[in-house]
Amino acid sequence: MSAAICAGVLLASGTAARGDAGAVSWQAPTPAPGSVVGVAAGTKVTVQLAAASAVRTATIRIAPASKLPQGARLSVTPGNPARAELSWIPRGAQVGTHPLRFNAVDISAVPVSSQALSFQARVAPGTVKLSGLENVSRWAFVRRQMIVRAAPRASAYGKARLKAWTPEYYPNPVLALQERIDRNGTWVQVRLPILPNNSTGWVKRGALGDFRITRDHLVVDRAATRATLFRNGVAIFTTRVGVGTSYWPTPRGEFYITEKMSGFHNVAYGPIAFGTSARSAVLTDWPGGGYVGIHGTNAPRLIPGHVSHGCVRLRNASIVRLARLMGVGTPLTIH
């Protein structure tokens, strides 16, 4: 017999205790005495309890026999059978084992008849994937300057420093990969705009703004000199592009769009440009060098081809169309 559990796991089970004829007894789907209900921190668990008596006129009530864990709620429906539902979203600080004790009492009996029940909830550290499932990705703006850690704890090595603004003074976004909830708090693994490319690190959840969702994904094929934008896994835009030469290659890897800009004085960038988290160890067309941009051009005759210093060039009509479809935070794959 198993407990009715949402987003939890009954780690050890058996048969709920039953009393003598006429006495109160626990009924399915109540967890068995001594069983263990497993749940990850940050995930909701729901446990159903039921108790009954063979005496038809009995009125049973289920009540906690000890203090419930902080944040847990018990809703009770007296009767015969009586029912109760325990719901709880444990926090990271509650990782560990929590005893749960209840009494089922026949409040109509003289003397009062009752049956005790004890089992455990075991809270494990919770990790939730934020991007890459069912064509959904999540990103957020950086609220304040922070140190990015190599692991989800404050004592971990600092890998980089993230600022609230990009080098071009736009709000700085990060692509969120997964969220970790444990005794160290809530941490988010993010993709980093640093060398080496494809670097990731962990930041405190409070250092980021609200998560925003995108179902888009831009893929740049260097060999085919082609860029394709997918939405919900379906291609909605494709165009030929210019990419880096062998001396100044466009880097491969997993990146994201950091900013969308227009109004350049330099016509070489065309009418619109996107900043990305991709970096080049040598040079790019981007102001200041080092970052890989996606932008228009004043030399459309060179597209398609391996013609840039690392940036991805589109004909101006194509970059304008792409700008109508794609926003900041979009994942970018270059291969």
For the regions a language model picked out, list residue spans one by one.
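Exposed beta-strand face motif in extracellular beta-rich ectodomains
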Residues: 96-100, 186
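Boundary regions of SH3-family modules and the immediately adjacent low-complexity/disordered segments
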Residues: 126-135, 191-220
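Surface-exposed or secretory-pathway low-complexity segments enriched in glycine-proline
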Residues: 24-30, 43, 47-83, 115-119
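Extracellular/luminal low-complexity segments enriched in Ser/Thr/Pro
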Residues: 85-95
